[in-house]
């Protein structure tokens, strides 16, 4: 689950992570009123959407007067902001964050992530702040420093200090940077985050260490113990199909292609998408029905896939372990009849009760194209979509 920058900064502020003063606003008039509450002559007007790259896309403006605050607010509110993370359709700006300006001395990057190679939380930092960390990693990886954190001990002060020295935090600010990083680690752990990222972290002319941005992602599996975080969810920022999928415990992520995919298991889903790409197709989604799919679940999965107007065909790739192929087959037949599917459909079944499942599909009388392997299924659906 993601939240807005202003919400992330409220969490930071409540847990001892230093941030500039700021206020959220939903209208241009409110933006001016909120700016008046700040003790500043310079204001930063920030579009609030669930996407990075806002600055490059024109979503962050520096205002030197209240009239400029109003001008920028009118310019941004209601705008479709297009960044490298939104896709070409962009996202509508419905709220702004009005923040006091800072005397920035230097910008840095800091973030806590879970390193899958070590299975531990890792602190990443760089003195190349204000730019995409992916670019830094690709072009100058030597400028990224890491500290692997022992989960029993937590982030040690000496690790935080070492990072501060490595990224050339001014000596007079190292103490504040150390305190900042320790507090930030506490946010990551206490709030069950999957990512906490600040880009940029800045040092100021008067020696402060501040978070000018706040990106927090939360582990969905831990939200049951964070009712306060759940209340911050902005459904308007999420794909309606992903919201609908979550109601049925389906993992759905929309993509840009035209071949709908229904698979059980994240690994098989990724392999399926790679195979479709290999044979010249483009997946329209990642959809994992999980290990306990029922007829109802399969039907809802079809409805969600077909909710994407770009879908021109569907590939169902199921390996029945816990899940039985005959149950999936019954669900597919019921779903095809209910949604009155007219698009090409290729189904590959393997595993428990596979022969019974194949028989159900064959005897249904429906236009379902069988496939013996994942590669054969991918080739068939790519061909059918191109011929359609």
UniProtKB/Swiss-Prot annotation:
Residues annotated as binding Mg(2+) are 199, 213
User: What is the role of the protein in this entry?
Assistant: Succinyl-CoA synthetase functions in the citric acid cycle (TCA), coupling the hydrolysis of succinyl-CoA to the synthesis of either ATP or GTP and thus represents the only step of substrate-level phosphorylation in the TCA. The beta subunit provides nucleotide specificity of the enzyme and binds the substrate succinate, while the binding sites for coenzyme A and phosphate are found in the alpha subunit.
Amino acids binding substrate: 264, 321-323
Q: List the source organism.
A: Staphylococcus epidermidis (strain ATCC 35984 / DSM 28319 / BCRC 17069 / CCUG 31568 / BM 3577 / RP62A)
**GO MF term list:** ATP binding; magnesium ion binding; succinate-CoA ligase (ADP-forming) activity; succinate-CoA ligase (GDP-forming) activity
Top-level taxon: Bacteria
Q: Which InterPro entries match?
A: ATP-grasp, ATP-grasp_succ-CoA_synth-type, ATP_grasp_subdomain_1, Succ-CoA_synthase_bsu_CS, SUCC_ACL_C, Succ_CoA_ligase-like_bsu, Succinyl-CoA_synth-like
Q: How is the cofactor bound?
A: Binds 1 Mg(2+) ion per subunit.
What name has this protein been given in UniProt? Answer: Succinate--CoA ligase [ADP-forming] subunit beta
């Amino acid at each position: 689950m993601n939240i807005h920058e202003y919400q992330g900064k409220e969490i930071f502020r409540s847990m001892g992570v230093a941030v500039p003063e700021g206020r959220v606003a939903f209208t241009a008039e409110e933006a001016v009123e909120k700016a008046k509450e700040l003790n500043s002559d310079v204001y930063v007007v920030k579009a609030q959407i669930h996407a990075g790259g806002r600055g490059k896309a024109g979503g962050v403006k520096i205002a030197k007067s209240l009239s400029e605050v109003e001008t920028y607010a009118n310019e941004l509110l209601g705008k479709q902001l297009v960044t490298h993370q939104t896709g070409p359709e962009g996202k509508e700006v419905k709220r702004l964050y009005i923040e006091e300006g800072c005397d920035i001395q230097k910008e840095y990057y800091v973030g806590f992530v879970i390193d899958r190679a070590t299975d531990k939380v890792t602190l990443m930092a760089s003195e190349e702040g204000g730019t995409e960390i992916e670019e830094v990693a690709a072009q100058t990886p030597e400028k990224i420093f890491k500290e692997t954190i022992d989960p029993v001990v937590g982030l040690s002060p000496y690790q935080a200090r070492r990072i501060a020295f490595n990224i050339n935090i001014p000596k007079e600010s190292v103490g504040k940077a150390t305190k900042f990083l320790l507090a930030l680690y506490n946010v990551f752990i206490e709030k069950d985050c999957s990512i906490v990222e600040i880009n940029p972290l800045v040092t100021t002319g008067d020696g402060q260490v501040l978070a000018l941005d706040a990106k927090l992602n939360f582990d969905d599996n831990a939200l049951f113990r964070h009712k306060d975080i759940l209340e911050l969810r902005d459904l308007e920022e999420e794909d309606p199909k992903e919201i609908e999928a979550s109601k049925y415990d389906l993992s759905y992520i929309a993509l840009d292609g035209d071949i709908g995919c229904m698979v059980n298991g994240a690994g098989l889903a990724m392999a399926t998408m790679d195979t479709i790409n290999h044979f010249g197709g483009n997946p329209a989604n990642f959809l994992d029905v999980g290990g306990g799919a029922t007829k109802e679940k399969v039907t809802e999965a079809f409805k969600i896939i077909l909710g994407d107007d770009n879908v021109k065909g569907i590939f169902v790739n199921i390996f029945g372990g816990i899940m039985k192929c005959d149950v999936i087959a019954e669900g597919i037949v019921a779903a095809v009849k209910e949604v009155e599917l007219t698009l090409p459909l290729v189904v590959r079944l393997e595993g428990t009760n596979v022969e019974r499942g194949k028989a159900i599909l064959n005897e249904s009388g429906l236009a379902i194209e069988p496939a013996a392997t994942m590669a054969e299924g991918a080739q068939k659906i790519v061909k059918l979509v191109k011929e359609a």
